């Protein structure tokens, strides 16, 4: 069994910080579960164009408000606590945070640890692994 404490994990290299977000990666590829699980905070006012070319992702809103726009059809979906959006076709999208948002994210294939978005809005398939348990 694996047991991790979010508050302890955010004090280790499991916490990855970028300019508009930070993410605590609680479950990663090295845990051999076939997916990764993160608690990600999107900062108020953030606008994040993304397209996960190598990963599928589901995102459940725990707190805050914003919207996600799918670029293929221009549809805008409100995001608030209790809403999940699923990127099941490597969808090109823009996430906008009206307030600070806390999201529970699941990736398949799992992230290795220190991924950040590249210029296209994607994560690489492999990145540096974290060292903390």
UniProtKB/Swiss-Prot annotation:
One of its GO terms (biological process) is ectoine biosynthetic process. Pfam families: Ectoine_synth (PF06339). The lineage of its organism: Bacteria, Pseudomonadati, Pseudomonadota, Gammaproteobacteria, Chromatiales. Pathway: Amine and polyamine biosynthesis; ectoine biosynthesis; L-ectoine from L-aspartate 4-semialdehyde: step 3/3. Its EC number is 4.2.1.108. Keywords: Lyase. The keyword Electron transport does not apply. Catalyzes the circularization of gamma-N-acetyl-alpha,gamma-diaminobutyric acid (ADABA) to ectoine (1,4,5,6-tetrahydro-2-methyl-4-pyrimidine carboxylic acid), which is an excellent osmoprotectant. GO terms for molecular function: ectoine synthase activity. It catalyses: (2S)-4-acetamido-2-aminobutanoate = L-ectoine + H2O. This is L-ectoine synthase. It comes from the Bacteria. It is an enzyme of class 4 (lyase).
